[in-house]
Amino acid sequence: MHKNTHTKPDVNFYDKSGKTPLDWYSDYNATKIVETLIKNGGNVSSVYSRCSYS
């Protein structure tokens, strides 16, 4: 059982899809960056070329 006493994400915990809390956090931030670039008329493809998606 996981106790709710952690002050930072438990990197050893995985959800059903195999993602850790840090994976969710980085995915969320990447989405927000892309949304902001689109709003500002930025080039989204340049962002994706810098990120390595496996």
Curated annotation (Swiss-Prot):
InterPro entries named in the record: Ankyrin_rpt (IPR002110), Ankyrin_rpt-contain_sf (IPR036770)
Gene3D superfamilies per UniProt: Ankyrin repeat-containing domain
PROSITE patterns named among the record's database cross-references: ANK_REP_REGION, ANK_REPEAT
Keyword Transferase recorded: no
TM stretches of this protein: none
Protein name, entry field: Putative ankyrin repeat protein RC0701
The ANK repeat ranges on this chain: 17-46
Keyword entries, A-Z: ANK repeat
Keyword Repeat annotated: no
